Design a protein with these regions (language model features):
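Basic, alpha-helical terminal appendages of large translation-related enzymes
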Residues: 260, 264-271
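Short Gly/Ser/Thr- and Asp/Glu-enriched loop/turn motifs at secondary-structure junctions
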Residues: 137-139, 220, 262-264
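A beta-strand-loop signature enriched in Asp, Gly, Thr, and Trp
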Residues: 185-261
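Structured, contiguous alpha/beta core segments that scaffold functional sites
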Residues: 1-196, 202, 206-209, 213, ...
């Protein structure tokens, strides 16, 4: 039941020093995780030694450049399209590290933005509503009335002149001067409309829920515990650990040989 770090293992340098010629391990990890969060899938192509098939390079690629598919026999493959050249290659599933966000089929992940689309659309609508509301000096629309009838051209002219003088923050608190016989009746804002404007404030909580990040880390809400250590443990177990577990499982299965797995070897990431 003892555990030992294999510092001289051929994968040690690849994982902790240089995964490929262009990137450090931290850059490769951040790039891959960014693709998971924004695209639902993080991919790294495994370049193997032509003689012993040992992984020689790990190359992160954009989530949109790879598409999983099954052949007629039911075997899983990955179709890779080079973003620079347009060249297409079919890759064996064991030559692609595939990390997923939430998935409905276990093959393709769904991005946070896709799952949050409805809420984001509502928040954007609330933002546009609020901008329009305050561009009108935070005043609801109203009705100008006059005892006599006006032609359409005359109505448009009166409306345009009124909005020019009284709309906008810069025209706040200006005194309205009405022509003889003209009256202005404001239309009060409903409680429902007021709540819709305030709804924009809950989007911070939405972001917290979508990404699984505690509210206090986004500058809102309170910490769950008085101890920073306990809050750190909660963040690791609730937010980080689900991803780390997936990384370790995928890395161990595809980077180690079957003979190594049978001897109890596995790849563990530091947290």
């Amino acid at each position: 039941n003892t555990k030992a770090k294999l510092k001289n293992h051929p994968l040690a340098h690849l994982l902790s020093v240089r995964p490929n010629e262009a990137m450090t391990p931290s850059v490769a990890k951040k790039l891959t995780h960014c693709n998971i969060l924004l695209g639902g899938n993080g991919y790294q192509i495994i370049v193997r030694d032509s003689i012993n098939a040992r992984p020689r390079e790990l190359i992160p690629v954009p989530y949109y450049s790879i598409e999983p598919f099954f052949d007629t026999s039911g075997k899983l493959w990955y179709l890779y399209t080079n973003p620079r050249t347009g060249e297409m290659r079919r890759l064996n599933q064991f030559d692609v590290l595939h990390y997923k966000a939430y998935s409905e089929d276990g093959i393709t992940g769904i991005s946070v933005l896709t799952r949050a689309q409805e809420t984001i659309s509502t928040a954007r609508a609330a933002q546009r509503y609020e901008n329009k509301f305050y561009s009108m000096n935070a005043q609801p629309s109203g009705v100008l009335t006059i005892d006599t009838s006006l032609a359409k051209e005359a109505k448009d002219k009166v409306r345009a002149e009124w909005e020019r003088i009284h709309s906008g923050v810069d025209n706040s608190f200006r005194t309205a001067v009405l022509d003889l016989g003209m009256k202005y009746q404001p239309i009060s804002i409903s409680n429902k409309d007021a709540q819709f404007i305030e709804s924009k404030a809950v989007t911070v909580e939405d972001i917290s829920r979508f990404f699984g990040v505690p509210l206090y880390k986004l500058g809102a809400g309170k910490q769950s515990y008085d101890s920073n250590e306990q809050n750190g443990i909660e963040y690791i177990s609730g937010t980080i650990h689900p991803y780390i577990s997936q990384y370790e499982e995928e890395d161990s299965y595809k980077l180690l040989f079957d003979s190594e797995l049978s001897r109890g070897m596995w790849i563990k990431r530091n947290m």
